């Protein structure tokens, strides 16, 4: 489908020139779109980090992704261009060669029909306008039905692959070190979305006090990381915490940092709202807190999960994958994700 992300005339021209130069066969223009969407710094090629951010599917390990990257990189430049992507995937398309060709025709047909609708709808009769609306709705229904079938097939194949693997390696989850400046990590609480925020109404206002307690714990973690970065770190005696045998010792804290493009801010907020609502309803999700940094389109999402297994299962859900795919278009740079195990005793349930 046609991507809504705007491009400059120069980038459009370069894409047309590249397409002409490569003489792409029918259906292969999708790889021009893949390159444009995954190429976050707009240099016309994909680094390994950009490749990993776009192609990681939660099944291949980091090592396997690295091997695939260098297999595709036949020019040995440590970057991928459209020619290399087309050359590799064209050898493995099978029946999907016809699918991609049909999608290319469908994309052009839909754009042509919508252009005609935009031009003629206002002057059409009531009956003609009704027919246009009906056809748009039914076209959308057909496309959504196809999308549902594809999502089921995708989920089934991924699950089958995981089950068939002997001693499966750990799926790739982006884990990038914290930025160097401590100030960029500091929580600015006055800009956080509180549980009763009209923009992110994902929690009951009754949990506001609990939210404040959790922000205290988050600040405590960030101060600890700040101290660890200092060169004059002095080790101090620790207070030992005695854990009962049947007590779960740790929970998982996930920090996700997302820099959103200004033009996609509203769409991102809607996608984030749907994601938080779905994730919060999952068993094993203890808490999700969202903050927007001052004067920036940068979001910090803190997710608390019962353990790493629950978190990894969450990554394979449809709602999580949908959010990850949408972020390819909405984010200026690939998402930064860090995980940390924290004492489970910090989690205080109010309803105990």
UniProtKB/Swiss-Prot annotation:
Coiled-coil region list: 135-163, 209-275
Main location: cytoplasm
Modification type Phosphoserine: residues: 4, 192, 197
Location(s), subcellular: Cytoplasm
Single GO cellular component term: cytoplasm
UniProt keyword Ribonucleoprotein present: no
Residue segments, region Disordered: 155-202
Domain of life: Eukaryota
GO MF, one annotated term: calcium ion binding
One annotated GO biological process: blastocyst hatching
Polar residues bias spans: 190-202
InterPro entries, sorted: ABM_dom, Dimeric_a/b-barrel, EF-hand-dom_pair, EF_Hand_1_Ca_BS, EF_hand_dom, NECAB1/2/3
Domain EF-hand residue range list: 26-61, 60-95
Keyword annotations of the record: Calcium, Coiled coil, Cytoplasm, Metal-binding, Phosphoprotein, Repeat
Keyword Repeat: yes
Domain ABM, chain residue ranges per copy: 252-340
Ligand binding (Ca(2+)): 39, 41, 43, 45, 50
Subunit annotation: Interacts with STX1. May interact with CPNE6.
Protein name: N-terminal EF-hand calcium-binding protein 1
Source species: Rattus norvegicus
